[in-house]
């Protein structure tokens, strides 16, 4: 099994000037080719500021880096993988920076939480969505679920009530926890504040659970949008294995 970290762009948060990487993840295990999250919608490539405004993101921040290399197809290409190779597509949650290109992998089995999939469309942003649920074969998750041995989807409600994180065990590197937005950055744990969460109390419980799991398993805890960690991580075409 091996893991690659994908670069889906850079976003600036107006409130604090924080510049956050937009990650995706690709995992190979045996004959399975697993993509986790898909970044922003392709419309952002032509007009990032205009689409930010029309999607209601304009009051929150702006996409400051989004090139034709910062999408799933291009990032997978760095690894010698084509979109048609993807067997499984995991959606951690339905926000705008995670769900934008889920329609580009029609052959893949989609893994999404039951709570998230029960929404008429992905939550996207501010209750408006330019994304529909794809017609993929879909597995809905409401409890810890192994995709394959060594890759477990873990419900982590709070940021959204259908949020999923992943726990995987790499043969040499060891255990990795992909928290996604269940823990965006370590400040959330240090301050014990989850102000952007759909349910802050549930978010707190999920974050504490993941932290305890990381301590217990001596795991690498990968945050969803930590500027410092983002600068230090190896990204595609490099691997963790």
Predicted features by range, described:
Residues 41, 52, 64-81, 85-97, 104, 112-155, ...:
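Metallo-beta-lactamase
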Residues 1-65, 209, 216, 228, ...:
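Zn-dependent metallo-beta-lactamase
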Residues 100-106, 232-234:
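Metal-dependent catalytic neighborhoods of phosphoester/phosphodiester hydrolases
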Residues 17-20, 157-161:
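A short catalytic or substrate-binding loop motif that flags glycine-/basic-rich loops and adjacent residues
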Residues 109-114, 178-180:
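Short hydrophobic/aromatic-enriched beta-strand-loop microsegments
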Residues 4-6, 34, 90, 111, ...:
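Hydrophobic/aromatic beta-strand patches that form the interior of the parallel beta-sheet core
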